[in-house]
A protein has these predicted regions:
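Conserved ABC ATPase signature
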Residues: 134-138, 142
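Conserved beta-strand-loop-alpha-helix hinge in the C-terminal portion
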Residues: 214-236
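Conserved ABC transporter NBD signature motif
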Residues: 60-67, 80, 113-117, 217-219
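The feature captures the beta-strand-to-loop junction immediately N-terminal to the Walker
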Residues: 37-39
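ABC-type ATPase nucleotide-binding domains, specifically the catalytic core motifs of the NBD
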Residues: 16, 72, 97-115, 123-125, ...
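ABC ATPase C-loop
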Residues: 151-152
Length: 249
């Protein structure tokens, strides 16, 4: 059996006297997509940030690519091939699109940087058309495409995408999902924290549902039927992008 590329074991996270995660465990196989679902405040973003080294766990262990990264700083984890795309756009709004991409690949070998930027633009051609435009002046959907392009430009082993469709119209969100699908087809492992529950489950191989910081349910994505969704998510179950085809940016 292939060893997990990412393993979270009995993870606790506290913010002062308030505990956000309680003994959360998760195993992610290489090349798969795991959907992390839950209502607002369930702990999805806390889990993502703890894995990425942005929030220190109070207990538990995180292993990535065979190495314990529990206490590693975020920049070191990123260099190991784990890229985190934060909720609310991971871009530099006062830099141009192309400068955002240049910043993303700054740690790559100089000779490899042009090809890395070209690959990123190939995934989202609209970014090539906006290359000299300030990132902050892009539409919300274009900003999220840029955030994803920045993450994928460095050819990561694993991407944690935290609520990438947040604030986007369904049709625009679908273009972001297509970018994630493309990344998955290229062999990149994805941990997807998402509000579009059904669309996330369509894309995912497995699913973990958080409820108030605890693991409420885990299993194959195809087994997360409506009963499971209603029981653990309730009002958090947002409609699919396809079901809101008339949505506007």
């Amino acid at each position: 059996m292939t060893a997990p590329i990412l393993e979270v074991r009995d993870l606790d996270v506290r913010y002062g006297t308030s505990q956000a995660l309680f003994g959360v465990s998760l195993a992610v196989e290489p090349g798969t997509v795991v959907a992390v679902l839950g209502a607002n405040g369930a702990g999805k973003s806390t889990l993502a940030r703890a894995i990425a080294g942005l929030v220190p766990p109070s207990a538990g262990r995180v292993t990535f690519d065979g190495r314990d990264i529990t206490r590693h700083p975020a920049h070191r984890i990123r260099r190991m091939g784990l890229t985190y795309i934060p909720e609310g756009r991971g871009i530099f709004p006062r830099l141009s699109v192309v400068d955002n991409l240049r910043m993303a690949v700054a740690q790559e070998r100089r000779a490899d940087r042009p090809d890395a930027i070209a690959r990123a633009v190939d995934r989202f051609p609209v970014l090539g058309q906006r290359s000299n435009q300030l990132a902050g002046s892009l539409s919300g959907g274009e900003q999220q495409m840029l955030a994803l392009a920045r993450a994928l430009a460095v050819s990561p082993k694993l991407v944690i995408a935290d609520e990438m469709s947040l604030g986007l119209a369904p049709l625009v969100a679908e273009s972001v999902f297509e970018g994630l699908d493309d990344a998955r087809r290229s062999g990149i492992t994805i941990v997807l924290s998402e509000q579009f529950v059904h669309r996330a489950l369509e894309m995912a191989d497995s699913c973990l549902i958080l409820t108030r910081g605890h693991v409420g349910w885990t299993g194959a994505a195809g087994e997360a039927g409506q009963e499971v969704i209603d029981r653990y998510l309730g009002e958090a179950d947002a409609p699919t992008p396809a079901g809101l085809a008339n949505g506007l940016q």
